[in-house]
Amino acid sequence: MSSLPRFSQINPATIVAELDTILAQNRAELLLLLSEIISLDWNFIQKLDDLDDRLQHFWSPINHLHAVKQTAKLRLAYNECLAKISAYSSELSQNSRLYQAIKTLDNGDYRFNYAQKKCLHNELRDFHLGGIDLPKAKQKRYQVIQAQLAQ
């Protein structure tokens, strides 16, 4: 993996398909991660971060390119991807199994350092801001609103 983005290799024609692949991989790995929980520890959070890093490594250069050197094709791909990323984000923030796993870590007898505790508290805060406490019907409405805001 290169340390700098290769902007010249970003192809608007393939961005949506590449994002779909990454989101599918992340969803599959999250399901596997949640199904394999035997004992929770900090490795669980690190694996979640790896999923986020994969998405950010892909999306950040595209987001930057969209801001500084926009073309019609890039704009179309970017807008289509925004809706998908928004849906994925809402899906994660309303995933009750993921929320419970992180809550269990936070409430457990683990000895985390300050940064780790802060990370857990921020994760739980983000779940609440993402609508985890809402009834299912209101969660769906929240997802619709988030999708509209992403447009």
Predicted regions and their residues:
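Zn2+-dependent metallopeptidase catalytic domains
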Residues: 1-151
